[in-house]
Amino acid sequence: MAKVCEICGKGPITGNNVSHAHNKTRRRWLPNLKKVRMVTASGATVRGKVCTRCIRSGAVVKPA
């Protein structure tokens, strides 16, 4: 699925833009996804979309 982290499942969330006059229009906050090469549990190298929190926390094992 597009715009979803393949490790943790984090996806878009919705809310409102609020102007100075308090007019509200719908908007989406998107996760900070990066395309990275990673090693799976079986040892294969695959490319996937992963959020930066998973990359920083070490949940992604990068190939040597």
From Swiss-Prot:
Keyword terms: Ribonucleoprotein, Ribosomal protein
GO cellular component: ribonucleoprotein complex; ribosome
Domain of life, source organism: Bacteria
UniProt record, GO biological process: translation
GO molecular function: structural constituent of ribosome
Presence of keyword Transmembrane: no
InterPro entries the record matches: Bacterial_rp_bL28, Ribosomal_bL28, Ribosomal_bL28/bL31-like_sf, Ribosomal_bL28_bact-type, Ribosomal_bL28_sf
Family, per entry: Belongs to the bacterial ribosomal protein bL28 family.
Record PANTHER family: 50S RIBOSOMAL PROTEIN L28 (PTHR39080), LARGE RIBOSOMAL SUBUNIT PROTEIN BL28A (PTHR39080:SF1)
Protein's name according to its UniProt entry: Large ribosomal subunit protein bL28
Organism of origin: Desulfotalea psychrophila (strain LSv54 / DSM 12343)
Lineage: Bacteria, Pseudomonadati, Thermodesulfobacteriota, Desulfobulbia, Desulfobulbales
Gene this protein is translated from: rpmB
